[in-house]
Amino acid sequence: MSWRSESIWIEFITGSRKTSNFCWAFILFLGSLGFLLVGTSSYLGRNFISVFASQQIIFFPQGIVMSFYGIAGLFISCYLWCTFLWNVGSGYDLFDRKEGIVRIFRWGFPGKSRRIFLRFLMKDIQSIRIEVKEGVSARRVLYMEIRGQGAIPLIRTDENFTTREIEQKAAELAYFLRVPIEVF
């Protein structure tokens, strides 16, 4: 989603608060909880899950391995839930021609760098760069090349834009900023 006027362009960036991330966190939580329950029931000799008898799974080595996978899955699930709740990666890109300033804001993990705020002068922007890699794991990324800073990604790599859409977005942004486009 974006908002534009003659002198200001604001591009809102969706972070990790997506339906797919929610589904993966939920599925991983349920699966790892199941593994942990099976491992615990094999250790205690009681049936926590009524699908099979606890005597079918011997604690050493199957029960230990299932408990380990359950605990590891719960940690990964906790990480996914935290990134989902904190909305890591969301923010905005603000291009202001009137002031000649570009502001990039992203939410990070809690701590010193929770708020990531970058500010550049428009005259320091060298170009808008498109990186396209076709194949099995196709990747299309839009970068802003800054003098002395390198390339800053403007679009998340997991967003599946077509080549036409990324070219259109790059052309509009390059026209607005009055900079050239580079393709790699």
From Swiss-Prot:
GO term, biological process aspect, one: photosynthesis
Main location: plastid
InterPro entries: PSI_Ycf4_assembly
Membrane topology category: Multi-pass membrane protein
Residue intervals passing through the bilayer: 22-42, 57-77
GO CC term (a single one): chloroplast thylakoid membrane
Compartment list: Plastid, Chloroplast thylakoid membrane
Pfam family, one: Ycf4
This protein's UniProt keywords: Chloroplast, Membrane, Photosynthesis, Plastid, Thylakoid, Transmembrane, Transmembrane helix
The keyword Membrane belongs to this UniProt entry's keyword annotation: yes
Function of the molecule: Seems to be required for the assembly of the photosystem I complex.
Family designation: Belongs to the Ycf4 family.
Listed name of the protein: Photosystem I assembly protein Ycf4
Protein's gene: ycf4
